[in-house]
């Protein structure tokens, strides 16, 4: 909340010659007693292309300021023509009326100013060298541009409106970088945890697969052992059968299977019994 409010500004001498002083009747309201004076300042914008040509026409301190509505007449000197580029002397420019409290600007009023020659002949055929004595100004007082700023007053805490300090932006950037680094580290840790979590089941799965492969190999070995045992048993049975046949041949003096008509016959158990 602003303690001082600008109620109105009246341009007293308008239009006027370029060399005439500026006069403003300023009305404002003060809501609370102030410890410091108000500083009013008028600035003439000499060029729209560079701030180097700006001229501070005048500044005054007003105070002590009583509570209530106050009015005063502010008079400022005209700008120096030699400090203004010749190409922009007779043209449209801007003047700025501002007020500050304790070095802090809280209100600014801007006006457009049209500078032109005072005769039709000079306006239609301007001379190469500007004739300042024939230049008049016309302030567009009906269309001011008012800008207000929040500042610290006497009854407000400094913490609410901290002053600008050099290097604060750099510190904030450093803090942001640290936060980003912490976020990246956190993201890396989370990624590592996820990788660890994904490795866990895979590792178990690989272990299970390894055990299954070992079981399969063991089964294959067992099967091979069984096949070898079966082959050994068959070989033993074959050997026993050959021994039995040889014994029968020794007893009868002729082979067991007698050939009839050139065909071999296999004796049945009955035939074997009869022969004995």
Curated annotation (Swiss-Prot):
Compartments where located: Nucleus
Chain coiled-coil ranges: 202-243
BP term (GO), one: silent mating-type cassette heterochromatin formation
InterPro entries linked: ASF1-like, ASF1-like_sf, Hist_deposition_Asf1
Record keywords: Chaperone, Chromatin regulator, Coiled coil, Nucleus, Transcription, Transcription regulation
Keyword Nucleus: yes
UniProt family annotation: Belongs to the ASF1 family.
Protein name: Histone chaperone ASF1
The encoding gene: ASF1
